[in-house]
Each structure stands twice: as structure tokens, then as C-alpha cells.
């Protein structure tokens, strides 16, 4: 019997991450990179672990504080924070920020998720698919000061979010988004990085020509809304891409 090729990959042992959520006492400064200041508990919990990452976060923090104004947010509104230094990236948003947003929404359903910039505006659709409608953005070019913010932990390491939590996020999205698989998965999809910010495929035209022989479709997910992406993946039998 031929062993499935995926069996050659070793399973990695890691502690699955589930974000803790809580209300911070007093007034806290929140930067556009998601660092929480003035808190012995929440400042380290808002940054990934690892020396080189923390050095980079410190550089970004100092630059941000030196160049951006500080705006006090309304005291009569409860704000939740779910972003970090890397969550403008789609992978980190889906696997880190969405679980954090769900944790806040379940514990504090009246909290408004506060996102740091217009770069995140296209992510609002993913929050609505979780049933989160109250979404706001940092004032343009600013860091913010918030009284008693609702905070969620940043993962210590990348790619460690609890699989059970990710499945919960997925199931809620499918339910709230009213997604139904009307057809069995029958597509072979190749996700191109042609419109990505980096990690381009040097021989992509040749690769796409070869995949076309197997009736694979080449797509740029940047051209699809979130709901369109979910619908496409429901039709996908074989997915091909890189990270």
C-alpha cells in the first residue's frame, strides 16, 4: 500500500493559543501597531515573543509615538482591540485577529472593535460574518488613548492559534454568512501571488501553463470579496499555492 505523501511531514508540537480577554483598568495608550502602553500586564501581552520581533516592535513603537498625534476616544463607548504589528497581513488577520475578535464579542458583546487604519476597512466584512456589526477606526494618522479598553492577547508565536478555536471561527462564519455548499467541491484552484506584496513566483507563467493541463484555474484572491473567497473555497477540491 502506497503511503500518502503528506505522511512524510512531521507534526509540530506546540501549545495551542486561545486569547485571554479583559478590561484594562484606567486609561491606556494603544498604538496603530497594537501595542498597549501603561500596563504591566497588557503591554507584554500585546507583542509577539522573540527578541528580534520585540526589537522591531520597539522601533515601530518609538517611531509611532514620535510622529503621530494622540487622540482620546469617547469615554461613553467601549472599545475592543484585536490588532497587532502583523495583522494587516491577511493570514495573521484571519488566524489571529478574528479569533481575538470572537473572544471579545462573546465576553463583551457591546464592545466596538477599533481598527487602526483604513488598510483594515476591507476586513470589516470578515467581522460582520462573525456577527460583529459595531466597528470603528482610529482617527487618521493617530494613536489613541482609551479609558478601560477591552483587550485581547496577541499570540506569543505565529501559527499557534488553537485548531479548535479556528474551527469555531470557521463554523460561525459559515453560519452567519449563510454559506451553503450547493455543489460538491470539483475545482482545482491555483492561488497566484501576482498581486501580492512579495514572494512572487519567478516562473509563474510556465507554472500556470503546466497547471492548465490539469484544468486548474489561476486566481488572485485580491480580486474577490471575503464572501466570494469562502464560496470559491467551498467549490475547491484541490488547492495549490505557496506562502
Language-model features: where?
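The feature primarily captures lumenal catalytic ectodomains
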Residues: 1-243
Amino acid at each position: 500500500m502506497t503511503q500518502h505523501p503528506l505522511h512524510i511531514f512531521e507534526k509540530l508540537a506546540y501549545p495551542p493559543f486561545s486569547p485571554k480577554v479583559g478590561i484594562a483598568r484606567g486609561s491606556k495608550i494603544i498604538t496603530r501597531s497594537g501595542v498597549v502602553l501603561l500596563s504591566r500586564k497588557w503591554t507584554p501581552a500585546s507583542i509577539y515573543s522573540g527578541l528580534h520581533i520585540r526589537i522591531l516592535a520597539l522601533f515601530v513603537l518609538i517611531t509611532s509615538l514620535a510622529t503621530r498625534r494622540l487622540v482620546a476616544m469617547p469615554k461613553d463607548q467601549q472599545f475592543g482591540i484585536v490588532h497587532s504589528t502583523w495583522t494587516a497581513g491577511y493570514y495573521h488577520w484571519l488566524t489571529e485577529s478574528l479569533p481575538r475578535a470572537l473572544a471579545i464579542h462573546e465576553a463583551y458583546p457591546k464592545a466596538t472593535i477599533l481598527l487602526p487604519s483604513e488598510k483594515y476597512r476591507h476586513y470589516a466584512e470578515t467581522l460582520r460574518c462573525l456577527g460583529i456589526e459595531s466597528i470603528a477606526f482610529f482617527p487618521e494618522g493617530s494613536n489613541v488613548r482609551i479609558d478601560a479598553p477591552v483587550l485581547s492577547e496577541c499570540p506569543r508565536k505565529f501559527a499557534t492559534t488553537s485548531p479548535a478555536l479556528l474551527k469555531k471561527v470557521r463554523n460561525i462564519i459559515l453560519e452567519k454568512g449563510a454559506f451553503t455548499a450547493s455543489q460538491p467541491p470539483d475545482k482545482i484552484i491555483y492561488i497566484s501571488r501576482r498581486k501580492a506584496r512579495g514572494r512572487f513566483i519567478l516562473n509563474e507563467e510556465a507554472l500556470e501553463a503546466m497547471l492548465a493541463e490539469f484544468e486548474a484555474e489561476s486566481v488572485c484572491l485580491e480580486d474577490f470579496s471575503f464572501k466570494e473567497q469562502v464560496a470559491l473555497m467551498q467549490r475547491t477540491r484541490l488547492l495549490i499555492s505557496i506562502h
